[in-house]
Each structure stands twice: as structure tokens, then as C-alpha cells.
Amino acid sequence: VPLLLLTFLISCKGNSQNKETPNKAYPVSKTDAEWKEILSPLAYDVLRHAATERAFTGPLTYNKKTGVYVCAGCQTPLYESQYKYDSGSGWPSFDRGIEEHLEYDVDYKIGYPRSELKCNTCGGHLGHVFNDGPRNTTGKRHCINSAALAFIPTDEKK
């Protein structure tokens, strides 16, 4: 049994590496040093290294104001507040995004494929999409790191 477990763990580790999309050119491109200069340490880790913030810690998780959620890295509009809902997951959840600004990729980091969401303007990691969202709308749950977003209230939009 220990040998079988070890084999499984090595297999998962092997599957999680080298499966990411090759480097893609995005309209907004910065050096690592430039990203570090403009992003908070947490936003940098999430957007540039696909980290995940701790559940229930993000300032936008329970935001109920009307407005638009933009990429914290490049300010591209990603989500409208009318599609945000409380999934109970501890991260901001939306049943849909602004599709032309989202990129879908496959993430193998935990040993099996998940649908990763990225900003298609800067390539920043946002979170993942799951099929356990509200059945009366899209059935999708865009589970997004609060650190990957900035919020612009309706009265401040240009």
C-alpha cells in the first residue's frame, strides 16, 4: 500500500507540471519587476503565479455594491455586479463574466484538470469555473480571487 500511494503521488506531481499554455503574447505585457511594483504582494502572487488567497479573507467577497469588477493588474472589465452571488465558498462568485475579456485554460496543478480563468488582456490568473452554480441561470460558478479584482462602483464609472 505505501508503494502504491507513493506511485500515485509521483504520478500526480508529474501530471501537474509542464501542462500550462505556452507563453502567449497579451496586449498588456510587463516584466516581473514591473508587476511587483504595481501590484500588492498578494495580488502579484495570485495574478502572476496562480496562487489562491485564503477563503473568506478577500475584501470583495461580500461586496454588494453595484458596479463592475476589473482586473487588478490591467483594469480590464471582467464581471458585472448583477451576476455576483454568495456561493458560500469564501471567494467572490459570479454566474457569468464579460466573455470577451476572459480566457479559459486547463490547470493541472492539483493533479487533475480544472478550468482556469484568466484575464485575456494581461494573462493574470483570476480563479476557476465550476459547474455547480445557480441552476436557474447559467449553472456556472466563476470562483474568483478577490485579490485579482478591483471594484469600480457605478457612480465612479467613466
Task: Say what each PLM segment does.
Residues 5:
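Internal, well-ordered alpha/beta segment that forms a basic, Gly-enriched binding/recognition surface
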Residues 8-11:
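C-terminal motif of bacterial Sec signal peptides marking the signal peptidase cleavage site
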Residues 13-33:
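Sec-dependent signal peptide cleavage junction
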Residues 15-19, 71, 145:
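Acidic/polar residues at beta-strand termini and the immediately following turn/coil
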Residues 26-27, 36-70, 76-158:
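A short Gly-Trp-Pro
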